[in-house]
Amino acid sequence: MEDIQNYDINTIPSSSYNIWVAKRRSGKSVLCEYLIHQMIEAGLVDMCFLFSATDAGFNIIKDKECRFTDISKLDNILQFYKKANEYNKIVSKSKKIKLRTVIIIDDMAVDLKSKNFNILEDLAIRGRHYSYDPLSLHFHILSQSLTKVPRVCRLNCDNLFMNTIPSVTELEMILNENFYILDSSRTGKQDGKKLYHDLVTRDDFIFIVIENYKQNCKCYADYLKTYKADISVLDLK
């Protein structure tokens, strides 16, 4: 097996679109919260918002005004960023708005794909353009099912976090889109599939990170990482 390294939070793009796919109670929310904790510790975050129908978990976000059960509030944040982006284009460097924000959307992909909130694909394609330096905007989309996330979103995301995929159909989608890109021959596909299984069974609650933003990848280690939460630093009560 290739020498796949642990994920380093300092490699995350200045603005990013991230997808988390794993079944219920698999640890994806805990790992996402751990990533946010690491981003805060690294000085990469000023504000963090949670959109969740159940308003559960993510105790790291303590301010109730930053927790929403209605996805429609997301548009207010996006509109602010659009205006701040335009403002920063016309003012001097010292007057530019500097704001680094994380937005977590937890199992609300169905709402985002509805007629009223058809913004999931727009965020994947244009979301980063709402936040040019010194603005920063990170999206974390959590879903129990890969098929709930449109293919254009998967292909345009910066990072895809996942662990064991129980659905054969969804697993083949993951393998085709991410593990066969270096070698699509029969042997190459066998090697890619074996690597996936080796990584997801390496340790309990371990996740694979697919760094889609990486370019000129010549081996799996160039764009694949593993990631596991240190729960001792989190408030999981």
Predicted regions mapped to residue ranges:
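Post-Walker A helix-loop "phosphate-sensing" segment adjacent to the P-loop in P-loop NTPases
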Residues: 37-48
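Conserved GTP-binding G-domain of TRAFAC-class P-loop NTPases and closely related GTPase folds
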Residues: 151-237
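A domain-level signal for caspase-like cysteine endopeptidase catalytic cores
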Residues: 49, 60-61
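Short, hydrophobic beta-strand segments that form beta-sheet elements in well-ordered domains
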Residues: 46-53, 67, 139-143, 209
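Short, structured coil segments at secondary-structure junctions
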Residues: 44, 61-64, 155-156
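Conserved P-loop NTPase motor cores
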Residues: 16-38, 53-56, 72-188
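Active-site regions of enzymes building and remodeling cell-envelope glycoconjugates
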Residues: 61-76
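Pre-Walker A adenine-sensing motif
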Residues: 1-13
